[in-house]
Amino acid sequence: MPYRICLISLGCAKNQVNSEQMLYLLNQAGHEVVGEVDGCDVAIVNTCGFIDSAKSEAIDQILQLAEVKKAGGLKKILVTGCLSQRYEKDILESLPEVDGMLGTGSFGQICAAVEDVMHGGRPLYFGDKSGPIEEIGRVVTTGPGWAYQRIAEGCDNWCAFCAIPAIRGRYRSRTLDAIVQEAQELADLGVKELIVIAQDITRWGMDLYGKPSLALLLRELAKIDGIRWIRLHYLYPEIIDDELIDLIANEDKIVKYLDIPIQHIDNDILRRMNRHCTGDEIRALLQKLRARIPGLVLRTSLITGLPGEGEAEFEELCTWLREVRLERVGVFPFSPEEGTPAAVMTDRCEPDEAQRRADLILELQAGIMDDYNAACIGRDMTVLCEHRARSGMCSGRTYADSPEIDGTVYFTGAARPGDMVTVHITGCDDGDLAGEQIHE
């Protein structure tokens, strides 16, 4: 029978895609999916379990639902995703309010879990996290005009600080046909921007063709009518080759924005991280990318406070950032993840010091970003409109901005959400741009 269900999605974009798949299955089964927990038969929390802050957020959400359940406003709680995969026994023992769990290999069984839990069971579905990828439809929940497209699952990089391979399993590529078919379906829905994601998109095809084949996939995606922007997230530096660089430079649909997680520039820290490139190799790659791809915007993520990072290593990182002037940077203080090599390393940096260093990098980066935005003033830039207020003020993003992590363009004009329009940039403030739509 149909039930009233609320699905709460936490964590990263990859997790959001899993939530969209579960929404699709629940809708297909005839369940009523709503946005409020009160009065629901089942609340599903799709969790992240990667770093301490994400784990805390997930546990807090579960405890909030437990209070609603205790008050009679909710019947059952299901927990899915990375936290349940990683801490199955702990959740069972410490959170008796949880009525069932699904791991990262079992999203396709969500409807069975709902039926089970509503009939008095306590379902524990933990399929093979390294098994074949199950192709499931999606209910797109992102903003108008754009959607994530996940091209692979799992990870084979085994960075010393990261538990993702243990949580999500080995790297598995989706097939070319499955990805292209999904992209066409997204285009048919009005999606203009595909944001290509995986834990490591540069490795796509290794398990299918015996070599990294991202360029092959991107050529096929670029053929799809209606798709105007293809944005690339999480390219590992050691696999970016000349074929891929040439394609990015010459294919108009691939936006000149690359998210390359570098994490650090000091050789010893990179070695401790089990990264597979040196500081000099990173410098050479970024120099090559700048030379070959005009207008390139680079984003990276960094970690401060890894065991062994002293003042000298941190200062090398800051000096490099001042020199290379990356347009977009995310930084995280080191979080020791149990079961990872970095969690048992000696020569620890105190958490407060790791946070202080992260804050210093953000302060440094804010000035670099402000300089980039100031240089945009006077330019006419293509903007994907995402919101339009009753006042007529619109907001959206240029090619230089990825949703939720980068800046916004606020502009006057007649654009509707999902439209791609030309905006004359007239100002900037606190990481965002201002402008006026040019009516063509």
Q: What residue spans do the PLM features occupy?
A:
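Proteins enriched for Cys/Gly/acidic motifs involved in redox and nucleic-acid/cofactor modification
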Residues: 1-204, 243, 258, 280-291, ...
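A structural micro-motif
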Residues: 3, 31, 75, 99, ...
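Generic beta-strand/beta-sheet core signal
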Residues: 8, 197-199, 233-235, 261-263, ...
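Conserved SAM/AdoMet-binding glycine-rich loop
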Residues: 77-81, 86, 91, 188-312, ...
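Conserved, mostly hydrophobic/aromatic
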Residues: 159, 179, 196, 232, ...
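Short beta-alpha junctions and helix-cap segments that line functional grooves
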Residues: 244-245, 317, 410-411
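Terminal RNA-binding accessory module
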Residues: 344-440
